[in-house]
UniProtKB/Swiss-Prot annotation:
Known role: Mediates selective transcytosis of polymeric IgA and IgM across mucosal epithelial cells. Binds polymeric IgA and IgM at the basolateral surface of epithelial cells. The complex is then transported across the cell to be secreted at the apical surface. During this process, a cleavage occurs that separates the extracellular (known as the secretory component) from the transmembrane segment. Through its N-linked glycans ensures anchoring of secretory IgA (sIgA) molecules to mucus lining the epithelial surface to neutralize extracellular pathogens.
Domain of life: Eukaryota
Main subcellular location of this protein, as a coarse class: membrane
Location in or out of the cell: Cell membrane; Secreted
Name by which UniProt lists this protein: Polymeric immunoglobulin receptor
Organism: Capra hircus (Goat)
Keyword vocabulary terms for this entry: Cell membrane, Immunoglobulin domain, Membrane, Repeat, Secreted, Transmembrane
Species lineage: Eukaryota, Metazoa, Chordata, Craniata, Vertebrata
Length: 14
């Protein structure tokens, strides 16, 4: 948990 969360937030933040 950490990298996946960062990537998920980055994609959802688009």
């Amino acid at each position: 948990y950490g990298e996946t969360a960062a990537v998920y937030v980055a994609v959802e933040s688009r």
